[in-house]
C-alpha cells in the first residue's frame, strides 16, 4: 500500500474508533446525579458534568464515576445520618409506648393515692370531728410513706404498716381510757402488743397483705416502664462503626457515583448491611423479650389479686372498721394491756371526768367493689393495664426486627418484587449472597459489613444487664416479694417487705413483755451469736417483770 494512502487511512480509522467513545461519554453525563445531589442540599460545585476516572474513590468501585473525593466524603456522612434517623424513626413506636404509658400509669397511681387520702380525711372529719383532726398526722404519715415507697423510697411496707397500727393503738387507747394518765414508756409498752392483742380485729393483717402485694406490684410495674423507656431511648440512638458506615455508603450512595441515582438497593443486600450494622441490637432481643414477658405477668397481677385500685378505694372504710373493732373490744383490750404493762396512774380530775367518746360507734356505708371510678388520668386501672398489655405485646422482638422493618421501607430499597433492577453493591443486577442470621456471632461471614464478633458492644451489654436486673425484680413482684430499687447492696435485707409473716401461721397468742418494738432500721439484722445472748437476757427480764406484776396484783 502506498505510503500516502496509509497516511490518510490511519488517521481516519482512529477518528472512527473515537466516535463510539464520544457517544458513550455523552451517554454517561452526570446531569441526573447533579440534580439528585443538589436536592440533598449539597453544592453542585463538588460534582463534575461528566464521568471521570475513579482511582481516587475509597469506598465505591474505582471505575468511571460522577463522584469526586469531596462528594464521597459528604455522601458517606449523609448515609450515616440517614441510618441513624432510620433507626430512631423505626423504633419510634416502642419508645412512645413506654413514654406515654409510663406517664399515664404514674398519673393514675398518684391521683389514686391523693383521692384515697382525701376520701379518708373527709369521712373521718365528718365522723370523728375534732378527735380525728387532733390525731390526723397518724393518717397523713401513712399516706406520706405510701407515696414515698411508690416513688422508690427506702420504705419497708410491713414495718411502716405495723408502725401505723401501733401509733393508732396508742392514740385510741388514750381516748377509750381518759381516766388514766399514760407516760411515753407506757404507751410504748402498749404498742408492743398490737399483733398479739388484735385490738383492730383481722383488718390490719388483711390490709397488710393487700397493701404490700398491690404496692409492690404497682411500684415494680412503673419501674419496669421506666427501664423500658430508658433502654428504648438509649438503644435507638445508634453509633455506627467505621465498617458499618462504609457499607452504608456503598449501599445508599455508590449508585450516585455510578451515575444511577434512581436505582435503589436490593432488599436482600439491604438486609445483610443492616444485620451487620445492627448485630448488637439484635442480641438485645432475647433479654428484651424476657423483660416484656415479666411485665405482662405483673400486669396480670394488677388486674387480679394485686389490684391497687381495689385496695386503695375502700381503705377509709377498712380503717374505720378497725377503729370500731377497737371500740367494741375496748374493755378486753384495756384489761390485757393493764395486765401486761401494769396499772396506769389516774389522770387529773378534770380529764378523768370525760367519758370515752361515743362517736366511734358510727357505721359507714359498705364498699361496693363494682364502683370502679375513673381518675383524671382518664381511665380505671383495668382499662389502663389492658391498654398497656396490648402495646407491650407489640413491642416484642422489636430489635431483631429492625433490619426487616428498615429494608421494607420503599424509601430505602427497591423492594422484594424488584430483584433484578436493583443495586447490588457493584451494579444494577440481582443480589446473590445469602442472607445472614440475626445477632453478632452470625455476622462472622457477612459479605457487606466488617464485624468483629469478638468485641460485643459494651453499651448494649449494659442495657442487657439493666433489663436482666429489672426482669428479676418483676418476677419477685409477681410472687409478692418486695424489691429495693434504691439500695441493693445490702443482701441481708432479703426480699424486703414481701418476706414478712403475713399468713395464719404467725403467732397470735397474747404474751407478756417478750415482744420487741419494731426495729428503726428494717434492713439491719442482728448477728446470730449476739441474738442468742439477747434471747437469754430477754427471758430473764421477762421473768422479773412477771414477778413484779404478780406482786402488784396481790399487794
From Swiss-Prot:
It comes from the Eukaryota. Residues 348-376, 480-501 are annotated as: Disordered. GO terms for cellular component: extracellular region; Golgi lumen; plasma membrane; side of membrane; synapse. Cell surface proteoglycan that bears heparan sulfate. Putative cell surface coreceptor for growth factors, extracellular matrix proteins, proteases and anti-proteases. Enhances migration and invasion of cancer cells through WNT5A signaling. The gene is Gpc6. Belongs to the glypican family. Its main location: membrane. This is Glypican-6. Residues 531-555 form a propeptide. It is found in: Cell membrane. In the cartilage growth-plate, gradient of expression with highest levels from the proliferative and pre-hypertrophic zones to lowest, if any, in the hypertrophic zones (at protein level). It comes from Mus musculus. The lineage of its organism: Eukaryota, Metazoa, Chordata, Craniata, Vertebrata. Keywords: Cell membrane, Glycoprotein, GPI-anchor, Heparan sulfate, Lipoprotein, Membrane, Proteoglycan, Secreted, Signal. Residues 348-357 have a biased composition (Low complexity). It is a lipid-anchor; GPI-anchor. A lipid is attached at residue 530 (GPI-anchor amidated serine). One of its GO terms (biological process) is regulation of signal transduction. Residues 1-23 form the signal peptide.
Amino acid at each position: 500500500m502506498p505510503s500516502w494512502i496509509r497516511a490518510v487511512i490511519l488517521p481516519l480509522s482512529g477518528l472512527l474508533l473515537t466516535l463510539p467513545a464520544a457517544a458513550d461519554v455523552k451517554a454517561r453525563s452526570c446531569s441526573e446525579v447533579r440534580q439528585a445531589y443538589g436536592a440533598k442540599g449539597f453544592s453542585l460545585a463538588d460534582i463534575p458534568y461528566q464521568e471521570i476516572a475513579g482511582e481516587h474513590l475509597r469506598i465505591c468501585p474505582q471505575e468511571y464515576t460522577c463522584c469526586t473525593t469531596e462528594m464521597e466524603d459528604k455522601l458517606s456522612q449523609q448515609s450515616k445520618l440517614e441510618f441513624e434517623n432510620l433507626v430512631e424513626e423505626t423504633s419510634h413506636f416502642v419508645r412512645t409506648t413506654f413514654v406515654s404509658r409510663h406517664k399515664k400509669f404514674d398519673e393514675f397511681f398518684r391521683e389514686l393515692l391523693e383521692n384515697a387520702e382525701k376520701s379518708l380525711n373527709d369521712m373521718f372529719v365528718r365522723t370523728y370531728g375534732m378527735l380525728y383532726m387532733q390525731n390526723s398526722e397518724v393518717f397523713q404519715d401513712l399516706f406520706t410513706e405510701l407515696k414515698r415507697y411508690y416513688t422508690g423510697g427506702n420504705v419497708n411496707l410491713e414495718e411502716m404498716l405495723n408502725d401505723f397500727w401501733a401509733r393508732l393503738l396508742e392514740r385510741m387507747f388514750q381516748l377509750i381510757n381518759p381516766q388514766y394518765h399514760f407516760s411515753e414508756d407506757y404507751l410504748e409498752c402498749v404498742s408492743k402488743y398490737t399483733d398479739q392483742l388484735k385490738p383492730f380485729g383481722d383488718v390490719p393483717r388483711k390490709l397488710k397483705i393487700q397493701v404490700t402485694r398491690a404496692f409492690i406490684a404497682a411500684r415494680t410495674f412503673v419501674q419496669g416502664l421506666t427501664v423500658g423507656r430508658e433502654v428504648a431511648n438509649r438503644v435507638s440512638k445508634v453509633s455506627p462503626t467505621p465498617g458499618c458506615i462504609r457499607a452504608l455508603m456503598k449501599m445508599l450512595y455508590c449508585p450516585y457515583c455510578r451515575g444511577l441515582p434512581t436505582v435503589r438497593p436490593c432488599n436482600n443486600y439491604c438486609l445483610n448491611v443492616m444485620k451487620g450494622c445492627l448485630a448488637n441490637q439484635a442480641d438485645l432481643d432475647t433479654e428484651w423479650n424476657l423483660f416484656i414477658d415479666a411485665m405482662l405477668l405483673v400486669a396480670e397481677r394488677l388486674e387480679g389479686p394485686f389490684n391497687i385500685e381495689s385496695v386503695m378505694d375502700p381503705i377509709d372504710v377498712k380503717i374505720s372498721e378497725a377503729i370500731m373493732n377497737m371500740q367494741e373490744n375496748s374493755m378486753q383490750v384495756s384489761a390485757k394491756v393493764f395486765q401486761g404493762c401494769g396499772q396506769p396512774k389516774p389522770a387529773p380530775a378534770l380529764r378523768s371526768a370525760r367519758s370515752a367518746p361515743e362517736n366511734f360507734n358510727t357505721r359507714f356505708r359498705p364498699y361496693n367493689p363494682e364502683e370502679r371510678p375513673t381518675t383524671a388520668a382518664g381511665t380505671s386501672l383495668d382499662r389502663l393495664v389492658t391498654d398497656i398489655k396490648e402495646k407491650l405485646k407489640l413491642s416484642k422482638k422489636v430489635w431483631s426486627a429492625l433490619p426487616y422493618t428498615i429494608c421494607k421501607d420503599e424509601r430505602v430499597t427497591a423492594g422484594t418484587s424488584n430483584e433484578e433492577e436493583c443495586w447490588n453493591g457493584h451494579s444494577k443486577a440481582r443480589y446473590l449472597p445469602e442472607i445472614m442470621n440475626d445477632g453478632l456471632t452470625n455476622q462472622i461471614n457477612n459479605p457487606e459489613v466488617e464485624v468483629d464478633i469478638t468485641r460485643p458492644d459494651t453499651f448494649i451489654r449494659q442495657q442487657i444487664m439493666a433489663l436482666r436486673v429489672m426482669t428479676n425484680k418483676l418476677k419477685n413482684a409477681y410472687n409478692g416479694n418486695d424489691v429495693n430499687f434504691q439500695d441493693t447492696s445490702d443482701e441481708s435485707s432479703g426480699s424486703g417487705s414481701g418476706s414478712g409473716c403475713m399468713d395464719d401461721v404467725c403467732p397470735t397468742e397474747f404474751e407478756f413483755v417478750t415482744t420487741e418494738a419494731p426495729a428503726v432500721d428494717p434492713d439491719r439484722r442482728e448477728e446470730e451469736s449476739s441474738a442468742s445472748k439477747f434471747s437469754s437476757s430477754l427471758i430473764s427480764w421477762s421473768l422479773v417483770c412477771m414477778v413484779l406484776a404478780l406482786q402488784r396484783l396481790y399487794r
